[in-house]
Amino acid sequence: MSSLLLFNDKSRALQADIVAVQSQVVYGSVGNSIAVPAIKQNGLNVFAVPTVLLSNTPHYDTFYGGAIPDEWFSGYLRALQERDALRQLRAVTTGYMGTASQIKILAEWLTALRKDHPDLLIMVDPVIGDIDSGIYVKPDLPEAYRQYLLPLAQGITPNIFELEILTGKNCRDLDSAIAAAKSLLSDTLKWVVITSASGNEENQEMLVVVVTADSVNVISHSRVKTDLKGTGDLFCAQLISGLLKGKALNDAVHRAGLRVLEVMRYTQQHESDELILPPLAEA
């Protein structure tokens, strides 16, 4: 094995601004398959750690793949430190997780990582389900999020359904959703961005609500009728990119929403069932 060892000079190691931990597909534009190119468009470096590796989303007539084994998953995380590739790390984002054990492994890694990176921004998209589909992850994941990842996160981006699951509160009107989000805030968890609050259906409006201890900001966007998948993953990629580029939270959320709308319309114009990223006007 020693004869195969070529690269041992850690001063030459690639560095990343972001580690993105979520699903990956061979075909399609969800999870890291859309987040990584979106982050790179913003001029940031990212390492992608897969939680599941799938042929495509389950919305096609064939579907292959599954969750990454725990041994592999923990090894992927450990290898980033063994390569000394995290010296400039600024943020870790999480999306779709394959198993509750992955969440625990990730939390242990993040806890250790924060000792060397006390200012690390941890943003969690607690992917659990939605109003139309219900829970579409394994049933032990919501509790794993509550127990392991929420205590480490500075910000989370649940939809209404996920907010209800995490808090046990009804969130179908704006005031109750805001109250539920506030109940999650802590010394560590500084903000909740609700990505699908109730808007005006007649006016084709959708709301994104930014909740902090001191303020509530309701951002309205046009609703685009579509079955496109991966829009939430794209939103989170744009949001973390905006924050790392120095945008204030409300501005970063607003810009992320506008970018998602732009990508959705561009994709529709090109008659694709998978998101297509147009060039980014402002890198």
From Swiss-Prot:
Keyword vocabulary terms for this entry: ATP-binding, Kinase, Magnesium, Metal-binding, Nucleotide-binding, Transferase, Zinc
Enzyme Commission designation: 2.7.1.35
Database matches in InterPro entries: PdxK, PM/HMP-P_kinase-1, PyrdxlKinase, Ribokinase-like
Record carries keyword Kinase: yes
Protein name: Pyridoxine/pyridoxal/pyridoxamine kinase
Assembly and interaction partners: Homodimer.
Annotated binding of ATP, by residue: 125, 157, 162, 195, 221-224, 231
GO molecular function, a single term: zinc ion binding
Domain of life: Bacteria
Catalyzed reactions: pyridoxal + ATP = pyridoxal 5'-phosphate + ADP + H(+); pyridoxine + ATP = pyridoxine 5'-phosphate + ADP + H(+); pyridoxamine + ATP = pyridoxamine 5'-phosphate + ADP + H(+)
Chain residues that bind Mg(2+): 136, 162
Job of this protein: B6-vitamer kinase involved in the salvage pathway of pyridoxal 5'-phosphate (PLP). Catalyzes the phosphorylation of pyridoxine (PN), pyridoxal (PL), and pyridoxamine (PM), forming their respective 5'-phosphorylated esters, i.e. PNP, PLP and PMP.
